[in-house]
């Protein structure tokens, strides 16, 4: 089945919308749409994760270091390291959680 990835989830005012595309023993693939001003506060995860920005611009903080990502950019979130996500403007991202 062919599809346009960024069309799989829509923005909602003052919300973060997510849709799980795959959820397997080896990992998961989730698409997110962050409305402007939304954020995920600092947290950790037990697995490595790969983020790709598929629309807009995002601010990802890993262990206190801020990274500004544009559409098409990717970043790896190491397991057990504190990270946060901030939407100064609307953006969409793919999150690949890689379980070991």
Kindly give the residue locations of the regions a language model identified.
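A short, N-terminal "cap"/entry segment at the start of jelly-roll beta-barrel domains
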Residues: 1-26, 61
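Conserved short histidine dyad/triad with adjacent acidic residue
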Residues: 15, 30-45
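Structural motif
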Residues: 28, 57-59, 66, 82, ...
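Glycine- and acidic-residue-biased ligand/ion/polar-headgroup-sensing regions
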Residues: 47-59
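A cytosolic small-molecule/anion-sensing beta-strand core signal
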Residues: 54-55, 70, 89
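Short acidic-glycine-tyrosine-enriched beta hairpin
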Residues: 64-79
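Ligand-binding loop in jelly-roll beta-barrel domains
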Residues: 79-100
């Amino acid at each position: 089945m062919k599809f346009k990835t960024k069309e799989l989830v829509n923005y909602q005012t003052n919300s973060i919308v997510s849709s799980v595309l795959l959820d397997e023993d080896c990992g998961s693939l989730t698409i997110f749409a962050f409305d402007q001003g939304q954020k995920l506060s600092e947290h950790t995860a037990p697995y490595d994760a790969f983020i790709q920005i598929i629309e807009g611009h995002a601010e990802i903080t890993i262990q206190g270091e801020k990274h500004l990502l544009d559409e098409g950019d990717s970043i790896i979130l190491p397991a057990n390291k504190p990270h946060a996500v901030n939407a100064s403007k609307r953006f969409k991202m793919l999150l690949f959680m890689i379980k070991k």
